[in-house]
Amino acid sequence: MSSNRPIKILFDSYHLYHLPQFDPVIDLLSHDDRFEIFHSTCSDNKKIELDLCLTVLESKPGTLVFAETEEERMEKIRALDLDVFICGWSRYPIGKFVSNNTLVGMIYHGIGVKPSYWRDNSTRLNIRFVEGQYRMDQLVNNGIETDLVLTGFTKLDPLFHGDDERFNDLKNSLRLDPNKKTILFAPTFYPSSIEKFGMKLGEYTMDYNVILKPHMWTYFLDEFSEYNLKPQRKLVYNLSEKFDHIKLLGPETYNIIPYYQISDVLLTEASSTIYEMIALEKPVIVNRFFRLKLSHKLFRYRLFRKRLSKEMNDDISNFCFEMEKASDLPSMLETSLQDNYNKLDIMRDYQKKMLFQLDGKASQRVRDTILDRLENRS
């Protein structure tokens, strides 16, 4: 690696929801003269997502690489002769974007309970940055031979940088009632519980602030695997219009991380958000009721085969509060806020397993690993 020019590194935010994992690394490298930063996103994405992602990426430090087609994007990125290419998943022909000499790394876009975590591992990956020892073991046990490096979860770094003023500004911008506890409701798009709540969600939570953060697919997709997402989208808008205490975050709010800090309890399904919230040792309520498509109602095992890891899904019950029906929400909120201390020891065990070091320095470990691998190559 020549020392006469900066290291060319591109962050490929294939989808906008990949970007929160990259943001702390981008911020770190933007203050490091050894690196020249580039950004890109998939040109085949739906226009509503593509336009928003391009707007966000244009605001980031570095150079945006845009093309009208994926073929043109491949050519433009390959012509950069990158030193490093970072992706958030690897289920596309990465080898066509880079030369054989490019170091390809993956900071995976989620830490949740989906089997895709270990199924998504292209042979073109040179290195994979891993959030915790549990995941290291899981990848190895599923036959992954990529160079695995234990760094911690970069996405969580901002939670440990002590930016209290920013968090206070966030509270004020949402006009949260300071006399009420705050619920962060982060329903995934499928399988989701929000339709089981319906408009009753507003009634069940009248004594709280609610920050409602739907998955981006709720906004961007009309259908997912024959499941209609339009009613979900209509419902979240109706809830925020009818109830003043429900604050809806639009798709432009692509990063949920700051909202963990200003919330008292997380409400969700089996998703990555669980492991992100426990980094702050706050209570998590997991909804065990969903609106399912017919094939998953009839053959529940298909849900676990395609969407969930049964082992991790079962583990959640050890450190979360589980809810079997929507009408239990008022009492479950009280229980979770009062009794979370009973689960702290187990929660801390899972922190160590899933999240390695919660010191705000995962991004530094990613940077140092990149520098080390490039140095050893030369």
Q: Which residues fall in each region the model found?
A:
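Catalytic binding pocket for nucleotide-activated donors in carbohydrate/polymer assembly enzymes
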Residues: 272-350, 354
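C-terminal alpha-helical cap of glycosyltransferases
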Residues: 359-378
